[in-house]
Each structure stands twice: as structure tokens, then as C-alpha cells.
Amino acid sequence: MKRTYQPSTTRRKRTHGFLVRMKTRGGRAVIAARRAKGRKRLAV
């Protein structure tokens, strides 16, 4: 059986990257929440 996590940098960036987050209102909310919390990494 193949494992579920098959890492791919391209796919990772395209689905969870900063620019993708900034596209939608919800994504911007995620970034804002992470900024407020003081996260070192805002997005992948």
C-alpha cells in the first residue's frame, strides 16, 4: 500500500502558499490570525 503523504514542493506551495492564502478573504484571515499569534512562519 502506498503511503498517503507524497511530498511535492510545487503542490505544497500551490495549495498552502502565502499568495494562495492572500487570494481569499478566509485566507487573509488565516494570515492575520497567525500574525496576531506571533507565528514565525505565516504560510508554508
Curated annotation (Swiss-Prot):
Q: Name one Pfam family in it.
A: Ribosomal_L34
Q: Which domain of life is it from?
A: Bacteria
Gene Ontology biological process terms in this record: translation
Under the heading InterPro entries, the entry gives: Ribosomal_bL34 (IPR000271), Ribosomal_bL34_CS (IPR020939)
Keyword annotations of the record:
Ribonucleoprotein, Ribosomal protein
Q: Which Gene3D superfamilies does this entry report, sorted A to Z?
A: 1.10.287.3980
Question: GO molecular function terms here?
Answer: structural constituent of ribosome
**Keyword Ribonucleoprotein, does the record have it?**
yes
Q: Would you name any one GO CC term? A: ribosome
- HAMAP family, per the entry: Ribosomal_bL34
PANTHER family recorded for this chain? LARGE RIBOSOMAL SUBUNIT PROTEIN BL34M (PTHR14503:SF4), MITOCHONDRIAL RIBOSOMAL PROTEIN 34 FAMILY MEMBER (PTHR14503)
- Give the family per the record: Belongs to the bacterial ribosomal protein bL34 family.
- Name used for this protein in its record: Large ribosomal subunit protein bL34
Gene name tied to this protein: rpmH
